[in-house]
UniProtKB/Swiss-Prot annotation:
Cellular location(s): Cytoplasm
Source species: Thermoplasma acidophilum (strain ATCC 25905 / DSM 1728 / JCM 9062 / NBRC 15155 / AMRC-C165)
A Gene Ontology BP annotation from the UniProt entry: chorismate biosynthetic process
Name of the protein in its database record: Shikimate kinase
Gene Ontology molecular function: any one: ATP binding
Swiss-Prot/TrEMBL catalytic activity: shikimate + ATP = 3-phosphoshikimate + ADP + H(+)
Residues that, per the record, bind ATP: 70-80
Pathway recorded for this protein: Metabolic intermediate biosynthesis; chorismate biosynthesis; chorismate from D-erythrose 4-phosphate and phosphoenolpyruvate: step 5/7
Family: Belongs to the GHMP kinase family. Archaeal shikimate kinase subfamily.
Top-level taxonomy: Archaea, Methanobacteriati, Thermoplasmatota, Thermoplasmata, Thermoplasmatales
A single GO cellular-component term on record: cytoplasm
Name of the encoding gene: aroK
Length: 268
């Protein structure tokens, strides 16, 4: 049976774009795989119908999702999901479409469907290319991207889930977030991610206990991933990350990911 399969990854916030539209994220090795097959239009899910209409695809689809990304915790599951689904549908249909076109389609559909307030080009970019991406989400431009050392990462997703579709921020945080942007564009990606998490943690709340446990176990960097509530820690070695997980009692030990999106098409 003919089908297409796409694998991408979740990520961690470097700069959350809710304040001024500037965004950034880096990829972690927590995969999501989406498989699409031809389906019946009467049973098609709305998200695949929206993508199909946007890309002018006639075929109706059914699909399955196999994901290790905790959803609703600030680890980029929505962007990975919509990008992988759109890419799989394009691959299945044999559409010649550029990376930027598929990311633009995914961003527009994310905003229209309420999955994202900004379109999250930064999150889509890290899911497309791996490594890190810095973007202008309002102008839909990738400003910088590159590889990172594949250091061990512990992510702990706990607490109430938080939607990215509707985010309300009261107060004047522009100056603070621009200092984060300065760090990121100077190449201090992890410092920026920490500072960004602290800013958004001050707005939405964060689990300082988890951050403290990671730092106590030897994390080089630890903070909240954007608006959270997931907490991340970056470690010099896997043993330290495993020890932190043991002390905390839960979490995913993984690593920074530099592998971009992968896809396969089967006609058997």
């Amino acid at each position: 049976m003919k089908y297409a399969r796409v694998r991408t990854h979740g990520g961690v916030s470097i700069i959350s774009a809710f304040i001024d539209g500037m965004g950034g994220a880096f990829s972690i090795d927590v995969p999501m795989t989406v498989t699409v097959r031809e389906g019946t239009c009467s049973e098609e899910k709305k998200i695949s119908e929206d993508i199909r209409r946007y890309l002018s695809i006639a075929t109706c689809f059914r699909f399955t999702v196999d994901s290790r990304i905790p959803s609703g915790y600030g680890l980029k599951s929505s962007s990975a999901y919509i990008l992988a689904l759109a890419k799989a549908m394009a691959v299945y249909s044999g559409i010649d479409i550029s990376d930027m076109e598929i990311m633009t389609a995914s961003a527009d559909i994310s905003k229209n469907s309420g999955l994202s307030m900004t379109g999250a080009l930064d999150d889509l970019c890290q899911a497309m290319y791996g490594g890190y991406c810095l973007t202008d989400n309002r102008k839909m431009k990738i400003l910088r991207r590159g590889r990172l050392p594949e250091m061990p990462v512990l992510v702990c997703a706990d607490g109430d889930k938080r939607s990215s579709g509707k985010v309300s921020i009261e107060g004047h945080f522009t100056n603070a977030i621009r200092r984060v942007e300065d760090l990121a564009f100077k190449g201090r990606i992890f410092d920026a991610a920490v500072a960004n998490g602290l800013i958004y943690g001050s707005i939405f709340g964060m689990d300082l206990r988890l951050i403290g446990s990671m730092l106590k176990a030897g994390a080089l960097y630890s903070s909240q991933s954007g608006k959270g509530p997931a907490i991340f820690g970056i470690f010099a070695d896997r043993r330290s990350a495993m020890n932190a997980r043991s002390d905390i009692g839960f979490g995913i030990v993984t690593k920074i990911n530099n592998q971009g999106i992968r896809y396969w098409k089967y006609d058997s």
